[in-house]
Amino acid sequence: MEFGLSWVFLVAILKGVQCEVQLVESGGGVVRPGGSLRLSCAASGFTFDDYGMSWVRQAPGKGLEWVSGINWNGGSTGYADSVKGRFTISRDNAKNSLYLQMNSLRAEDTALYHCAR
């Protein structure tokens, strides 16, 4: 019986830690076609440099689309064909932050952008 109680307690603790993960995006705005924006994502509640990170977006009335990804140390990146050559993903592990530099913006880039672990 003691073992069962300990196990339930451990699960409760782990679930509590998981709920504290936060990813807060900033830097969006309204720009003209051809303009630039830099998005930031501040991460907390987990060991940031243990994880690869991604940016995804959702255009009005459409589903989620993967935009770009980066491995734990920034040594490897990938991009959707639709943004290749225009967007640049980067990260600063010392600041627990993820970035997306978006250049040569087009009307079709209009979307809600989210960072994802």
UniProtKB/Swiss-Prot annotation:
Region of interest called Complementarity-determining-2, as start-end residue ranges on this chain: 70-77
Disulfide bridge partners, by residue number: C41-C115
Region of interest (Complementarity-determining-3), ranges: 116-117
One MF annotation (Gene Ontology) recorded for this entry: antigen binding
Entry-linked InterPro entries: Ig-like_dom (IPR007110), Ig-like_dom_sf (IPR036179), Ig-like_fold (IPR013783), Ig_V-set (IPR013106), IgHV (IPR050199)
A single BP term in Gene Ontology: immunoglobulin mediated immune response
Region of interest (Framework-1), ranges: 20-44
Domain Ig-like: 20-117
Residues spanning the signal sequence: 1-19
GO cellular component: extracellular region; immunoglobulin complex; plasma membrane
Binding partners and assembly: Immunoglobulins are composed of two identical heavy chains and two identical light chains; disulfide-linked.
Name recorded for this polypeptide: Immunoglobulin heavy variable 3-20
Organism expressing this protein natively: Homo sapiens
Gene from which the chain derives: IGHV3-20
